[in-house]
A protein has these predicted regions:
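Glycine-rich beta-strand-to-loop/alpha-helix junction loops that act as flexible
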Residues: 1-15, 50-51
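Flexible glycine/proline-rich
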Residues: 15-155
Length: 155
C-alpha cells in the first residue's frame, strides 16, 4: 500500500481512522519493513505494506504469509539456521535486522546493492539472515528465512 509510516506523505493511518479501523499492529522493530500495519474493520483484516519494495516484500513474508497460513490451519515451522561467513556489528537501535544475502561455501554473506528501496540485491539473494541488535560473529548460527521464489524453485 505504502503510506504506512508517519511522514507528512503517509495517509494510511488517517484513512483507517476515518473508516473506524482498529489498529492491531502499528509497526514492528525490524529493518527493512518496520512500518507494517495490521488493522481490522469489523471482522475484515487490512494489511498496510511499507512503500519501499524490499520493505513490502519483508512485510509479506514475515507478517502476511504467516497470518494467511494460520487462517488455513498450516502449522508454524521453526526457522532454518545459517552459519555467518562474516562478522555483523551490533546495531545502535533496538531492532532486528533481516540481512539480505546468499548461502555460499563458507557461510551466509550479505549481497551487494541492498536498500529498502531497491530490489536488485534481493534478486541475487536466497534469503534473509535474522540478526538481533547485538549483531553476529563469523561462525555463529542464526535463523534464516528463504525468499519465496527460492522455496518454489528448490522443490
Amino acid at each position: 500500500t505504502g503510506g504506512t509510516a508517519r511522514g507528512h506523505r503517509d495517509f494510511l493511518r488517517a484513512a483507517l481512522d476515518a473508516l473506524g479501523a482498529r489498529i492491531i499492529v502499528d509497526g514492528v522493530a525490524v529493518r527493512p519493513g518496520h512500518p507494517m500495519t495490521l488493522a481490522k474493520i469489523g471482522e475484515i483484516p487490512l494489511v498496510g505494506l511499507p512503500g519501499n519494495p524490499l520493505s513490502a516484500l519483508v512485510a509479506m513474508v514475515t507478517l502476511v504469509e504467516p497470518m494467511v497460513d494460520a487462517w488455513h490451519g498450516r502449522i508454524e515451522r521453526d526457522l532454518a539456521q545459517v552459519v555467518m561467513a562474516e562478522d555483523i556489528p551490533a546495531f545502535h537501535k533496538p531492532l532486528t535486522r533481516l540481512m539480505v544475502g546468499r548461502r555460499e561455501l563458507g557461510g551466509f554473506r550479505q549481497v551487494a546493492l541492498v536498500s529498502s528501496a531497491m530490489l536488485r540485491g534481493i534478486a541475487h539473494a536466497d534469503g534473509w539472515a535474522v540478526i538481533d541488535q547485538e549483531g553476529a560473529r563469523k561462525g555463529d548460527a542464526v535463523p534464516w528465512i528463504p525468499v519465496p521464489w527460492r522455496r518454489v524453485t528448490s522443490r
